[in-house]
Amino acid sequence: HIVAAGGKRIRPMLTLSSAKLCGYKGDRHLALAACVEFIHTATLLHDDVVDTSILRRGESSANLLFGNQASVLVGDFLFSRAFQMMVEDGSLDVLRILSHASSVIAEGEVLQLTTVNNTETGENIYLEVIKSKTAQLFAAACEVGAVIAKRPAIEQRALETYGINLGITFQLVDDVLDYTAKQRNLGKTIGDDFKEGKVSLPVILAFSRGTSEERQFWRRTLESLDQTDTDLEYAIKLMSKHDALSDAIKRARHYGSIARDSLGIFDDNPIRSSLVGLIDFCIERAN
């Protein structure tokens, strides 16, 4: 079910591409790319249990089909198998990077629990959540490619910077898509986050710029989850009124620019061009 569910496989691609960008000639990057995808898939399985989600990538989620117990246990297995493969690789640096990323992801999950149904969540906390939950694994996926190629620290840091800012860009756009995309493009129905009471940047901006009456709307729909059939449409109108969606995209472009600049120390070649193109892909998803 997990394999058939598909996905963009961006994270393992980052490991493969980063290794190639750094001139790596071996095959260790293949298993490490799999480790990265195992970690990511494990977090998705656990996420869907925590969020009681019923869809993942436009299809029924694993927890809906097989139950919470199976989803948690398979997620645990994938985490365990990833660490087993890291140990088999034999690099303490790789183990340090990916174990740190796994720990930060878990911290981000806990931090996000404090923001659900909390309209007072600030932009700084939101950014900390997406850095931890999403961007940290992007960064680790890139960094291990440079590590196994034995590149100098400056190149490792450059790829880490690229990954963290690409991850932020990706998540910012993803949160915009929850209010704008068609199911076939996003892999979930529009308004999933709204219905679950998740507070993302478009909500934060619309809430902070809104009138007292509008803020009461957000409190009712997101904090109390007292929602009617027309509330999602009204929420999108408020976001448009206060430029919340367009400003979130501007933030995404800002972080995308940082990611692009971080690749400047590498020679221009097809791999680097692909990594730059990935930034554009993440942003253009909003269109």
Per-segment meaning from a language model:
Residues H1-N287:
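All-alpha prenyltransferase/terpene-synthase fold signal
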